[in-house]
Amino acid sequence: MKQGTTGMYCEVGPCTNAKDAHSPCLRPPGYAKPPTVRVCRTRGHNLPLSKVPGPKLAALTKWYGFYHNVIRDGQYSLSFSSLHKKYDSPVIRIGPNAVHVDDPSFYQEMFSMTTKYYKEPEFYKALGAEGAMASILDPKHHRMYRNHLRPLFASRAVDGVVPRLKLELEKATRIFDMHRKDYHPLNIQALYRSFTSDMVCELLFGESPDFIGDGNGYHPFVAALDRFTAFSWLVVYFPWVKSIQFHLPFGLGDKLAPEFNDFKRQCETWEAKAQLKRESGVQVGQKNLFDYYAELGAGPETAVSGVAQPVEDAFNFLTAGTESTAYTLSSTAFHILNNPQVFKKLHEELDASVDFIRNDFNAKQIQALPYLGAVLKETMRLSTAVPGNLPRLVPPGGVTVGSVYLPEGTYPQQTIVSSSHLSIITNDTIFHDPYKFKPERWLGEEGKDLERWHVGFSRGPRRCIGSSLAYLELFCVTAYVFSRFEMSLFETDESSMQWVDRISARNRKDVQVRILSDRWEKEAHSIAGGTLLKEE
């Protein structure tokens, strides 16, 4: 329900009589009256988008997208490529006022630093807390907010968590060893979720909950976090679902969602400490996310306003930093183990770099390894963490794509346009043999030319703010794990790695491995044995 020029506006039109029993004003949250024949005819035939090809049901109702995203579990964006081919058009209609564009030059325009394409309000406000980074629509406001938080995610701050990363790797090693000795398969994706959760918490809050230290490395909170992401599309269509989660009374929340309630309590403690520090004017140690929240709205009138729901925003940061990085780490492990030549070349590079991986751990040198970098970029291309739609509004004056004109539309039927990362990473005019895992494409002159198409962290002013931490984890974890352990895939293949689009990608089954040996331990025994023989 939205405020229109003639009163309240709902899915089927203006409402000027709030006393009417059928008024949208009196309908419960989440209610959506099925579109009438008149509305369907208007949507399908009379709107300016009527000439854009696409499924007829998609033109009539947004519930067509609901069916493919919610009921069929994230299948809609996977169908766009075949729809573009079916209708032989770079633009297809995917909703009553929404289109998808498969055109690399348009993608570059939409995600440029000077883009005029603003975020689509309903999608992003459903996912982000009010006033939070994900839901800020105005570019100027977003830039101010991002600049305010930038020090927290800057390279210098990320460098400060390297000691924690080394500690996390040592804890992970114990879990690897346990599975090696028992010869039990290891769910490495679950382990990586705990690892990345700890690292994000260390950066955001200045302390880690030690999720990875929980026995098998899969803390109940991290498991709950994984389950929560399964409902991402449901939250987009019914935003109140997420609100319920964060506004349950503690007594009821402890019964229905104890892990989230524990996190909520901890966040409220951090928030209270931050307010106390701001009021006292005494800042001890590194500022955390809640310290930055406390400063919002405290400056001049031009300053960024505060976040209405800081706990929810903190949860969004944690979810984004956990799931996407863990998915990329797991996909990297799969691609390395599934491609013997890649495995061989990577081992050669890692073995030549043992001085700063094993002997004197140096994150900067690890992040400069060329072939490892190419492997990670190719993983982010072929297994991109956010493959689907990031919807935007067509700017004033409209835009022409090929021979198709897209009008800006009028409220509330503004034209929504998207150009998915999937359409870029599988484009055979950009990437030769796009479905093949070829790290070499990112090396040499070809690699320099492809850099503008490295979209793993998106592009433009809305690019992932946490990319520095993600890169640190991707490089250092992959280098350490594959330098130290011999392993093989267990019940993991191309079919289990097929993904669904839950805003972020989710493979059908977690990546599992068998730990075959500890190479460093074998080398230590070999050296010790050689020394003993010499003494004899």
Curated annotation (Swiss-Prot):
<keyword id="KW-0479">Metal-binding</keyword>
<dbReference type="GO" id="GO:0005506">
    <property type="term" value="F:iron ion binding"/>
</dbReference>
<dbReference type="InterPro" id="IPR036396">
    <property type="entry name" value="Cyt_P450_sf"/>
</dbReference>
<keyword id="KW-0408">Iron</keyword>
<comment type="similarity">
    <text>Belongs to the cytochrome P450 family.</text>
</comment>
<keyword id="KW-0560">Oxidoreductase</keyword>
<dbReference type="InterPro" id="IPR002401">
    <property type="entry name" value="Cyt_P450_E_grp-I"/>
</dbReference>
<dbReference type="InterPro" id="IPR017972">
    <property type="entry name" value="Cyt_P450_CS"/>
</dbReference>
<feature type="binding site" description="axial binding residue">
    <location>
        <position position="464"/>
    </location>
    <ligand>
        <name>heme</name>
    </ligand>
</feature>
<keyword id="KW-0349">Heme</keyword>
<protein>
    <recommendedName>
        <fullName>Cytochrome P450 monooxygenase phqM</fullName>
        <ecNumber>1.-.-.-</ecNumber>
    </recommendedName>
</protein>
<comment type="function">
    <text>Cytochrome P450 monooxygenase; part of the gene cluster that mediates the biosynthesis of paraherquamide, a fungal indole alkaloid that belongs to a family of natural products containing a characteristic bicyclo[2.2.2]diazaoctane core. The first steps in the biosynthesis of paraherquamide is the production of the beta-methyl-proline precursor from L-isoleucine. They require oxidation of a terminally hydroxylated L-isoleucine to the corresponding aldehyde by enzymes which have still to be identified.</text>
</comment>
<dbReference type="GO" id="GO:0043386">
    <property type="term" value="P:mycotoxin biosynthetic process"/>
</dbReference>
<dbReference type="GO" id="GO:0016705">
    <property type="term" value="F:oxidoreductase activity, acting on paired donors, with incorporation or reduction of molecular oxygen"/>
</dbReference>
<dbReference type="InterPro" id="IPR001128">
    <property type="entry name" value="Cyt_P450"/>
</dbReference>
<dbReference type="InterPro" id="IPR050121">
    <property type="entry name" value="Cytochrome_P450_monoxygenase"/>
</dbReference>
<dbReference type="Pfam" id="PF00067">
    <property type="entry name" value="p450"/>
</dbReference>
<keyword id="KW-0503">Monooxygenase</keyword>
<dbReference type="GO" id="GO:0004497">
    <property type="term" value="F:monooxygenase activity"/>
</dbReference>
<comment type="pathway">
    <text>Alkaloid biosynthesis.</text>
</comment>
<dbReference type="GO" id="GO:0020037">
    <property type="term" value="F:heme binding"/>
</dbReference>
